[in-house]
UniProtKB/Swiss-Prot annotation:
The keyword Ribosomal protein applies. CDD domains: Ribosomal_L30 (cd01658). Part of the 50S ribosomal subunit. InterPro entries: Ribo_uL30_ferredoxin-like_sf, Ribosomal_uL30_bac-type, Ribosomal_uL30_CS, Ribosomal_uL30_ferredoxin-like. One of its GO terms (molecular function) is structural constituent of ribosome. GO terms for cellular component: cytosolic large ribosomal subunit. This is Large ribosomal subunit protein uL30.
Length: 60
């Protein structure tokens, strides 16, 4: 059975943000603006996305 994935794109810079928010972006695998990654849809990933919702765009 295939696991569900989510596309996450960083839309804003991490410069000047809280260290925990920067760590969440790195945990998601995002490194620069307009960088897109596919991550598994798990509760921990959803939590990281919710923490930095103002800097990312999410597609199913």
């Amino acid at each position: 059975m295939a696991t569900k994935t989510i596309k996450v794109t960083q839309t804003k810079s991490s410069i000047g943000r809280l260290p925990k928010h920067r760590a969440s972006l790195l945990g998601l695998g995002l490194r620069r603006i307009n960088h897109t990654v596919e991550v598994e849809d798990t509760p921990s990933v959803r939590g990281m996305i919710n923490k930095v919702y103002y800097m990312v765009k999410v597609e199913d």
